[in-house]
């Protein structure tokens, strides 16, 4: 099992891509197959809910609810561990700080530049 915080952009990409063999789709498949165990907190769930419901992504409520309910049921709810360093994008701080709460976990993102450079922060291709 791989424990990981999944950045919102990975979920969005997995759902809107037409490439069923893309790395983001594989991350989501691995999550649903119990290979990747998602780590989350209430802020992360709130962002997932907000972003996935944006009209521009044209996602069905059933698909959004399936993803969010799965994460809440089978994932690990965790608190943030404060990180005093600078973040290129402060809106991403909760994702990074939650990833710090579980030893040997990862943060999977398509936006490496938004996070500190560390082996903990990986792309979808790197985690699959």
Describe each region flagged by the PLM.
Residues 8, 42-43, 110-112:
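Short secondary-structure boundary segments
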Residues 29-83:
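PIN-domain endoribonuclease scaffold, especially VapC-family toxins
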Residues 13-15, 51, 118:
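Residues that scaffold the ATP/ADP-binding catalytic core of kinase and kinase-like folds
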Residues 93, 100, 105-108, 112-128:
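Acidic, PIN/NYN-like endoribonuclease modules and their adjacent C-terminal/linker elements
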Residues 1-38:
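Short, well-structured N-terminal submotif of metal-dependent ribonuclease cores
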Residues 72-104:
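Mid-chain, well-packed structural core segment of small domains
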Residues 11-12, 46, 114-116:
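Short, active-site-adjacent cap segments at secondary-structure transitions
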């Amino acid at each position: 099992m791989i424990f990981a915080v999944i950045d919102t952009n990975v979920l969005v990409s997995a759902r809107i891509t037409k490439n069923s063999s893309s790395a983001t789709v594989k991350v989501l498949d691995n999550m649903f197959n119990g290979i990747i165990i998602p780590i989350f907190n209430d802020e992360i769930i709130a962002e997932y809910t907000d972003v996935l419901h944006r009209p521009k992504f044209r996602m069905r409520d059933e698909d959004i609810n399936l993803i969010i309910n799965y994460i809440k049921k089978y994932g690990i709810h965790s608190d943030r561990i404060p990180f005093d360093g600078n973040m290129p994008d402060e809106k991403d701080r909760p994702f990074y700080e939650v990833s710090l709460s579980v030893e040997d976990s990862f943060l999977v993102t398509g936006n490496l530049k938004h996070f500190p450079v560390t082996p903990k922060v990986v792309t979808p291709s790197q985690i699959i």
